[in-house]
């Protein structure tokens, strides 16, 4: 658990450092216009930057497998580890990493100063990760506190980290990633007309899909002993009550 508790905080600084050059350096060198004259769409250019950052995040996760295999072999008996739960935790880390990359790419598109891009990305990633949870902890919104908490990454990551993959959590991460890719596209396409209406329409569609997905969902308990699921006997008992 300590690995998966610490890793998001490492990502909080590592990923902005990886992504801060994405577009900021292009702006500083004056090559961004040249970049967009290539036979690629703006979306393809943004996604190529995004995928490049995501690949580096994947490589940064590989050394942590040593920790997993060490714990697995040193267990008593050997192999005494919840593989399903660990797999779920890695899914959560990957989703956080993918989200932070999209935030970092967006922040890099805002400025030509890499340091500014880094600082803004760190702040925004921190707010998305823990900010909403901190706001909800003050009970400012009453009955809406759970909704506010659900707007942040921390709530969804804790669910996945336990080894429970809920389509609502997956959809949340996909939505946040898509929104920041759209924000990046909007910033880089400000020179074009008709961008603003398309931006708002696409953003609204993404949010509506996420809202619909909160009502129709599936939940998968990856833990080997299904510790986060009701047993068949309990389900039968509750149905007969």
Predicted segments — roles?
Residues 193-216:
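Internal/C-terminal transmembrane anchor helices
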Residues 3-25:
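Long, hydrophobic alpha-helical segments
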Residues 1, 117-187:
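Terminal transmembrane helical anchor/hairpin motif
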Residues 208-241:
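Juxtamembrane extramembrane loops of integral membrane proteins
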Residues 5, 10, 48, 52-112:
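Secretory targeting signals
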Residues 18-36, 50:
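Transmembrane helix boundary and interhelical loop/hinge segments in multi-pass membrane proteins
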Residues 15-19, 67, 103, 183-184, ...:
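Hydrophobic/aromatic residues in alpha-helical transmembrane segments
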């Amino acid at each position: 658990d300590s690995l998966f508790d610490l890793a998001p905080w490492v990502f909080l600084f590592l990923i902005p450092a990886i992504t801060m050059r994405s577009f900021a350096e292009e702006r500083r060198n004056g090559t961004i216009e040249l970049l967009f004259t290539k036979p690629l769409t703006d979306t393809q250019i943004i996604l190529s930057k995004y995928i490049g950052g995501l690949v580096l995040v994947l490589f940064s996760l590989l050394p942590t497998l040593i920790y997993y295999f060490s714990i697995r072999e040193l267990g008593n008996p050997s192999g005494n580890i919840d593989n399903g739960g660990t797999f779920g935790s890695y899914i959560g880390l990957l989703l956080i990493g993918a989200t932070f990359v999209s935030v970092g790419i967006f922040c890099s598109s805002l400025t030509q100063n890499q340091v500014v891009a880094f600082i803004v990305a760190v702040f925004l990633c921190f707010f998305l990760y823990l900010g909403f949870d901190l706001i909800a902890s003050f009970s400012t919104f009453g009955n809406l506190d759970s909704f506010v908490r659900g707007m942040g990454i921390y709530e969804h990551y804790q669910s996945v980290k336990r080894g429970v993959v809920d389509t609502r959590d997956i959809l949340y991460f996909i939505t946040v990633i898509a929104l920041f890719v759209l924000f990046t596209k909007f910033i880089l396409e400000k020179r074009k007309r008709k961008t603003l209406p398309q931006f708002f329409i696409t953003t609204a569609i993404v949010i509506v899909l996420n809202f619909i997905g909160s009502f129709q969902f599936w939940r998968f308990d990856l833990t080997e002993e299904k510790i986060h699921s009701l047993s068949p006997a309990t389900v039968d008992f509750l149905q007969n009550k």
